């Protein structure tokens, strides 16, 4: 009797923690692949580092970094790292950002401003990739300081994280009794 019960339990599929992330269709864009070397007393050990932006083009975006001995595994590791670092971005009806924002991280500084419908993404480098994968279609962005692709992508994520919607501002500003 107990053996039958154990067999039935083995057949049941347990829900996984990240199953809902696998259902959504994510877009992965490779920003950079670089060959890196670790020098030891035995010689040089080559490996590859991949920087990937992952998002659903509907308000979710993340940046991931992966390192492995071959390019394919580095890309896979970067994708899983990007899925772990997903953030939600508020997008307006005109597929822009709600307000102007400045992202600051290390030596990188990024200024983003909303733009009118039809203007497109006016940005360069990694910032453009992050905005496109997030699903933002009309925005103006300027990157200042460092031109490092990984740092600029992370700074763009910091800037997008600091965006707030009108409802969030109302909740912060007013007491619950007023709303």
Curated annotation (Swiss-Prot):
Residues 26-89 form the S5 DRBM domain. The keyword Transmembrane does not apply. InterPro entries: Ribosomal_Su5_D2-typ_SF, Ribosomal_uS5, Ribosomal_uS5_bac-type, Ribosomal_uS5_C, Ribosomal_uS5_N, Ribosomal_uS5_N_CS, Ribsml_uS5_D2-typ_fold_subgr. Its main location: plastid. The keyword Disulfide bond does not apply. Pfam families: Ribosomal_S5, Ribosomal_S5_C. SUPFAM superfamilies: dsRNA-binding domain-like, Ribosomal protein S5 domain 2-like. GO terms for molecular function: rRNA binding; structural constituent of ribosome. GO terms for cellular component: chloroplast; mitochondrial small ribosomal subunit. GO terms for biological process: translation. It is found in: Plastid, Chloroplast. Keywords: Chloroplast, Plastid, Ribonucleoprotein, Ribosomal protein, RNA-binding, rRNA-binding. HAMAP family: Ribosomal_uS5_B. Part of the 30S ribosomal subunit. Contacts protein S4. Belongs to the universal ribosomal protein uS5 family. With S4 and S12 plays an important role in translational accuracy. The N-terminal domain interacts with the head of the 30S subunit; the C-terminal domain interacts with the body and contacts protein S4. The interaction surface between S4 and S5 is involved in control of translational fidelity. This is Small ribosomal subunit protein uS5c. It comes from Thalassiosira pseudonana.
């Amino acid at each position: 009797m107990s053996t039958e019960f154990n067999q039935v339990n083995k057949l049941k599929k347990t829900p996984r923690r990240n199953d809902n992330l696998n259902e959504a269709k994510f877009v992965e864009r490779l920003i950079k692949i670089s060959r890196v070397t670790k020098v030891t007393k035995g010689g040089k050990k080559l490996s590859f580092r991949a920087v990937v932006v992952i998002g659903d083009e509907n308000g979710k975006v993340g940046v991931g970094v992966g390192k492995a001995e071959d390019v394919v595994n580095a890309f896979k590791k970067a994708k899983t790292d990007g899925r772990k670092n997903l953030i939600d971005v508020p997008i307006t009806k005109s597929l822009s950002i709600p307000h102007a924002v400045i992202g600051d991280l290390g030596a990188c500084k990024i200024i983003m401003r909303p733009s009118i419908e039809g203007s497109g993404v006016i940005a360069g480098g990694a910032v453009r990739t992050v905005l496109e994968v997030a699903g933002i279609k009309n925005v103006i962005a300027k990157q200042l300081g460092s031109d490092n692709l990984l740092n600029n992508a992370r700074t763009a994520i910091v800037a997008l994280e600091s965006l707030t919607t009108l409802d969030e501002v109302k909740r912060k500003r007013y007491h619950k009794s007023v709303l």
